[in-house]
Amino acid sequence: MGKRTKKTSNLSSLDKPLRYILNEISNDKQISPNLNNIFKAFEYCSFSSTKVVIFGQDPYFQKNVANGLAFSVEPNESLPASLKNIFKEIQSDIGTLSNNDGYLKPWADQGVLLLNSSLTVAVGKPSSHSNIGWQNFIFEVVRAVNKKKNIVFVLWGNDAKKYIKYIDQDKNLILSSSHPSPLSSYRGFLGC
């Protein structure tokens, strides 16, 4: 398969979710993150620099909270409960925290791809875009990153764990636990 054909086939996995989102927006429905931020994870962490992939479920569903990086919020925003639990575990493991706000772009700058299983959600409706076709695109991303070696895949929650079967555990490391949200963090995230 030539490079041009391969790129086209990879982009075709975006057709269904993007059509859905554009239809929602044309019908005055709000999505999170906003249209300009949907692919920020890939803008801030290039394929070639990726060392770690942290999988979440879907973006924060509150208006203007999600910024395109899984678990991240804009600087000076209050910390969502999931991110508080992530920071609590980092503090517990290494005793310090490099940043005190929820803006995780510095992680992406260091090679951490902060990726949700669904890249969008309807404002006010958690998991609302879990079946609009993001899975095919995310599968393509996992497949591409999996071709590298010594990548750490961090899978938080059942939606993220669906991708385990596509990761070569002989050349990459998988760390998985429950989602860091307060609803499930006690099932294995806290203390992991």
Describe the residue ranges of each PLM region.
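Short Lys/Arg-rich cationic patches that frequently serve as NLS/NoLS or arginine-rich RNA/DNA-binding motifs
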Residues: 1-5
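A polyanion-binding, active-site-adjacent surface
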Residues: 11-155, 159-162, 167-168, 173-178, ...
